[in-house]
Amino acid sequence: MSIEDIGSEQAYVSALYDRLDELRRRTTTRLRGVLRQHESLPRARFERDAASADCAATLARIRAAENGLCFGRLDFDDGERRYIGRLGIFDEAADYEPLLIDWRTPAARPFYAATGAVRLGVRRRRHIATRRRDVTGLEDDVFETGSRAPGAAPGSTPAELVGEPALFATLNAARTGRMSDIVATIQTEQDRIIRSDHRGVLVVQGGPGTGKTAVALHRAAYLLYTHRDRLARSGVLVVGPHQAFLRYIENVLPSLGETSVVSATVEVLYPGVTVRRAEEPAVAELKGRAGLADVIAAAVRDRQRLPVGQTFEIHTEERLLLLERSTCARARALARESGELHNDARAIFVRAVIDALARQVADGYAAETITAQVLEADPAAFDLLAPAGSGGTSLLDDDDLAQLRQELRADPAVQAALAELWPILSPDQLVAELYADPGTLAAAAPRLTAAERRLLHRPLAEDDPDPDDDWLRELRAATAPTAAGDTGAGVGAAGETAGADAPAPDGARPRPRPMGGWTAADIPLLDEAAELLGDDDQAARAAALRERVARVAYAQGVLDILSRDIEDDPEIMMATDLIDATRLADRHEDADLRTVAERALADRTWTFGHVVVDEAQELSEMAWRMVMRRCPTRSMTIVGDVAQTSDPAGTTSWERVLAPYPAVGAPARRETLTVNYRTPAEIMAVAADVLATLRPPQQPPRSVREVGERPWRLRVDAADLGAQVGQAVLAELARLAPGPVGSPTAGGSGGGRLAVLVPAGRIAELTAAVRAVVPTAESGPGAALTATVVVLGVREAKGLEFDTVLIADPDTLLTESARGAHDLYVALTRSTRTLGVLHTADVPPMLARLSPADAPRTRPAPPGDASAAAPGPTTDSDPAAGTAPASTSPTASSAPGT
């Protein structure tokens, strides 16, 4: 590209940045003016804070557009020219003529959709590369001509790939541990999915490296732009497989100017409970079955009990009450027929029982009074009296009966009886006690085998404290006795509105939990229980009560100060004559200014306007029930690959996932991503052999590039596996970047990252072996994004990618779980360039395409293919020493295949 072209584009880009700076100055000035406003009325404060939030969001979008503001240009046959970028910029002096078009608008679509076969009126598409605010390069796609880009695999043509030079430049950068946006290199099949209708469920099936995650995130940004009024209120939820994955993608949406999306794993969607341990695969599979929903429902009904005998004796301090089984049966039927959730329906049950007991006591009063009057007149008439309590005219009026019902409701013996027959339950209590009691399990789960029920059985935790019980300490602190004249009146009023059935603070107790704590597989069961019980709101009430106590106390202090100097003068009206502390506090109650994301994560019942589920094949049937509740409109984007399912409770069929959920608004539809941008063709050929063994059969994605390097295998002695892995790491790390091996600079910035993927049972052992030669090596998902060398289990690497991958002990990977072949397929496809496999037995037949380590690893570069491995030393490894061969080659970076 000529210097004149670059200079011309630089002038235009500089003008765009000048306009961006002006927008930033205007918004900053407006924000300062808003923040200087001092409003006293709640409504005015709310409007001020809303304006402030709007300015802050605008500034965030401006900051996000700073890097790569303008990345493309379209020249049309009719002479029209459009510049494409991260946000829209307009010329106010020219009737708001667009200077830069937001990539999400319909006007920008030809930038991604135009091909040599379907030009859409586009004559030339220009990709503009920038560094900070400087134009560094231009690449043109002229649709009348074109040639395959260097490094493209055979079969790729300009009609299939958009902007090949820009795309391959992106692919050939080293991985950084964070995913970046692909807004400048979105491909045609990806763009079609990103812009598809928001209504209904969209399933995107795509093999490794096809860009499922990138498509899902850019679709979220597109929908927020297109339907902002609706989605800004309800929010967009992105569900990922694990926290390391969420950290991996966390910069993508902010870089696109979107900061209001909620990103969470399934277990985070149930607030207040922390996962403490991993679940055994067999137990996780069992807990993930849809049939467990029936078990939870049966457990709830089992806690709505009737007396064992015909009567239930209640010994109060004053009398013996007899509660008949038939009375309880009528009360239970009435409560169940109401359709209310368990804890809400309890009020109906309690009311019916209390009414029956009150009538019994009233009849007893009447009988006692009549008996006393008759015997006083004629003692010989005792045998003629009807049995006490058999009925008669009540001597109590309505007010007396109301008072009697209140007394019965407050009586400890009556409360204990009601708690036994129809207790207030939290989801934690219901599920933990279900696990702990074999008899309850047998009654609730008759369709499970005895062996399956034993898998679910887990004793209750007794003494180990749980950090999640901080709410209990807050509740007790908030309701501790205060000095006379404090906030008793206001707090008392709040307490009365809770109803007599609400548990007293002194009766609150830590939430039951299984021994060892909850697992990720328990979370959907807790959510299911919450749907049937109603939320346990003790923690929320504790926080609200604590806040109210503080607010009323502060208001009382203000009134005391205002009245201090004039309280002895009866002729002067004081503030306390007009308002009390409670009303003053209520007038200054703050509006809820939390963001949509903050409110959504704190509210289990929140429903989202759109939900994106990534690595969706890993969700169990119970987890799907949980996710579907968050989006009753079924506006969802589901992305995954059923060939990569690792979770024992995951799915291998999208049809099976969606079958229980009727379509809402629009039928479910399916798209397939077919192009692999991450995995080189040499590695994908090996992975395709593994894919061929899986059921149901899947078509492997087509890789767009070759790297000129064959994936290798090395057989080692089982006893020497750790040492051989360490030597292989040293050899491969030396190829990533210069610097002393094991130093922070080895494989550092610009060099790329290396992962050793191992069986779950050998992580500790092989991590120690790698650290023996590379002290800076890390292990576990917490280090998966930051360490140059990291040792991971396959499931910890799901959704991530690395420049170099070494797989240790594939035989154990294949046998340690029921989905071992799926795990091996995932492991093989994490690499963007180099793959090595170290095995201790005969190589599995499905890995037969791997080249022996003592064979040359690079192939001659085809004529004109500059991206193939550069000439250089290709040292063969010594199988006895276990050293992998060394060669020089470039690495790869985040691109459309992430």
Per-region residue spans from a language model:
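Intrinsically disordered or highly flexible coil/loop and linker segments, enriched in small
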Residues: 22, 26-33, 144, 258, ...
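Intrinsically disordered, low-complexity terminal tails and inter-domain linkers enriched
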Residues: 480-509, 738-750, 862-897
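ATP-hydrolysis module of ASCE/P-loop NTPase motor domains
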Residues: 279-368
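Hydrophobic alpha-helical scaffolding
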Residues: 157, 172, 235, 239, ...
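Extended, charged low-complexity regulatory segments
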Residues: 1-192, 583, 859, 866-873, ...
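P-loop NTPase Walker
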Residues: 2-38, 42, 131, 150, ...
